[in-house]
Structure formats: C-alpha cells, structure tokens
Amino acid sequence: MNKILQNLFLIILVSLTLSGCGSDSNKKYEGFMMPESVAEGPDGSIYVSEIGERDIDKDGKISKINRDGTIETVASGLYDPKGIVFHNDKLYVTDRDAVIEVDLDGTWQVYAGTMLFPKVPVFFNDIDVSSNGTLYVSDTGDFKESGFIFAVNPSGEIDLLFEGNDLIKAP
C-alpha cells in the first residue's frame, strides 16, 4: 500500500511539475512510449521507465525529467523496464526477467539475472528497497496461477518470499 501511495504521489508531482514548466500552461510533453513507473532521483529530478513499443525488444528506456522541465534519456536498450527505485545513488529497474542497476551517468548492467533466482522469472513487475539495501521484486508470473515475490540481498543471495496461490495471483 505504501508503494502505491508513493507512486501516486510521484505521478501527481510529475503532473504538477510539468504543468508549471515553461510560460505556456497548456504545454504538453510528448515522446514517452508506454511510461510505466516513476521515481524521484537524488537531485530531485523525476525518472520514468518506458516500456517502448509492444513486441519490439530492447526499445525500453529510462528517461529523466530535469528540474527545468527538459527531458533526456538516461539509459536505453532495455527490454521492458517497469518498476524503478533509487538506493545509494543507483537506480534499480525490473526489466522483464532481470534486475538492472543504472548509474547516474546512464551506464547499466544486470544486477540479478534470470539464472540466479530460485524460481525462473516470468514477468518482473515492481521493485522496492529496504534501508539495508535488500531489493524486493514482484513477478506477476503467467497472470493465472503463478507469481512470486523475491528478496535480492546486497550479498547477492536471492530468496523466494512468496509464491502465488488461489488467494493471491500475479502479485
């Protein structure tokens, strides 16, 4: 619930920021391709994950809305980036079946790949982080019976915390 409220707050913040940018109050920003999640960066800029076009691999990206209202691409070549969260000046991204770590200069690497997970990831969705750096990653699975929640510890160990069941499907 906290994550939902945080994302709602950030969406409102982005809307208010963009509505106040420039002298034209009706200015619309174009160019976002299937925006998914938002996170505030360490400098107050807003970062947006963009899935890109359907069925096109590696057209996903992370965009940054600077405080002056300009938009720039921070990282590109991702599959379908969804959830994003900052920790220690690094942006962590759920990208289809891997967790990606993005430096503020835009370079990125796979932080936790498919083969490291105790259950094979199907469709990573969201991500959050605890104060000790543990990343919590949801995988909606096949949207029917499966779905998982994983903990990716700073040591690199990955634990399965939850597996979907009849009561909760596709977390």
Whereabouts are the PLM-identified features?
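Bacterial N-terminal signal peptides that target proteins for export
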Residues: 1-9
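C-terminal motif of bacterial Sec signal peptides marking the signal peptidase cleavage site
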Residues: 18-20
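Beta-rich, blade/repeat-based domains predominating
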Residues: 31-43, 58-59, 77-96, 116-138, ...
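Beta-propeller domains
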Residues: 50-67
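A short loop-to-beta-strand structural motif that recurs across blades of beta-propeller domains
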Residues: 59-63, 98-100, 147-151
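Aromatic-anchored, glycine/proline-accented short structural segments
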Residues: 151-153, 157-171
